[in-house]
């Protein structure tokens, strides 16, 4: 069945009526006319790729230079021992007890066992917070915190933060994880005049690090960010709040169950407030 003459389709370039313009037949177009936008897009993409590659090369080169000029960390263990001798009797026992180590890692640096000395995601958050003026959002790994305690305790500013990042990477390349935790536990300040895990365990709870219970270990791990403000002897409620936070992080990371966290928080903290020395059990 054919079309009526007025409605039958007409070839390209032929109008239905004299006042109507039809598009040209695509086959009659100059190939260069439709190819130009595509070529422009490719040129833009190539330029973007070149810029990104240049930035990547520059970043790698900058990283290498910074790593080269950052001081060696071979004396880190000696520095930790010096802090021990200056503030308390060094903890002579085995590696950092599991309860405290797990509590510290869960709340301060949950990627500790998988990261290369620096948490790039956290660093990005800190950089964004600094640029936007929203203050410190956290982000220092245990390596960087240890680097600060050993090498730049009074430093500040972006230059010091970069140095701490590079020192943290060097610490990771030089020492095993267990040694990093041990040095951290030996030099960290826990408030109330207690430097080191041994002094804090003895001073607050009258026990050694190996004798810490779950709520005690969680409390001490929660002190490292605000040792004076969260001192459980002077600010008991704040310390319990930090304990609850650490227990929650242990639940989130799968180290304990919610029931265990609830039972631990229900226990009363047996605070002693001693000198921080003389504990043997």
Name every feature range the model reports, one short phrase each.
Residues 2-281:
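Juxtamembrane regions of bacterial inner-membrane/periplasmic proteins
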């Amino acid at each position: 069945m054919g079309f009526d003459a007025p409605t039958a389709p007409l070839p390209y370039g032929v109008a239905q009526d004299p006042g109507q313009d039809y598009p040209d037949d695509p086959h009659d177009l100059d190939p260069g006319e439709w190819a130009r936008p595509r070529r422009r897009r490719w040129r833009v993409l190539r330029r973007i790729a070149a810029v990104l590659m240049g930035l990547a090369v520059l970043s790698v080169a900058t990283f290498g230079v910074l790593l080269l000029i950052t001081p060696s960390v071979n004396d880190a263990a000696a520095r930790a021992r010096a802090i021990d001798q200056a503030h308390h009797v060094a903890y002579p026992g085995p590696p950092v007890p599991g309860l405290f180590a797990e509590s510290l890692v869960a709340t301060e640096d949950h990627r500790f066992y998988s990261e290369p000395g620096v948490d790039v995601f956290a660093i990005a958050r800190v950089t964004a917070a600094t640029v936007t003026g929203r203050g410190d959002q956290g982000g220092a790994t245990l390596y960087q915190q240890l680097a600060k305690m050993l090498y730049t305790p009074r430093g500040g500013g972006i230059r010091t933060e970069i140095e701490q990042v590079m020192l943290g990477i060097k610490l990771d390349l030089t020492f095993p994880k267990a040694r990093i935790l041990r040095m951290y536990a030996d030099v960290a300040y826990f408030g109330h005049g207690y430097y080191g895990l041994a002094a804090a365990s003895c001073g607050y709870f009258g026990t050694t690090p190996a004798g810490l219970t779950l709520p005690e270990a969680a409390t001490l791990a929660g002190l490292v960010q605000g040792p004076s403000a969260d001192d459980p002897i002077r600010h008991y409620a704040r310390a319990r709040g930090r304990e609850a936070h650490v227990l929650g992080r242990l639940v989130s990371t799968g180290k304990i169950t919610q029931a265990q966290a609830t039972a631990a928080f229900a226990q009363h903290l047996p605070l002693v407030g001693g000198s921080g020395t003389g504990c043997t059990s």
